[in-house]
Amino acid sequence: MLPQTPLFVQEIRGVPVCFKAECLQPIGAFKIRGAWHRLTALDDPARERGVVAFSSGNHAQGVAWAARKLGIPAVIVMPADAPKVKRDATLATGAEIVSYDRMTESREKIAAHLA
C-alpha cells in the first residue's frame, strides 16, 4: 500500500481548493500511483516474469519502487544521458537499468525485446 499523503485545503477567492501533497510520496512524485496500481493488478505468472518500463525519471522510480515492494523483478530502459540522480535513485530501489542512446536507438524496440 502506498503511504498516505496529506490533503491541504486552501480557500482561493472564496472557493475551497484541495491540494494533494504528492511530493511527499517515497519517490517525491505522483508517478508512483500509476506504477503501483498497474503492478498490483498483475497476476502471479506476470509477477514472476517481471516488468519492463522505459523512462528517464519519475516513472522509472515509481515502477522500480513498486516492483521492489511487491517482489517483482524490474528492468528500466533509460537513456544513457538521463540525470545521474534519476539513475542512482532507480538503481537504489533494486531495478536493473538498460541504457540506450536516444539519438540512435528506439526505447520501444529495446523494451519489447526485453519483455
Where do the language-model regions lie?
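PLP-dependent amino-acid enzyme catalytic core
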Residues: 1-115
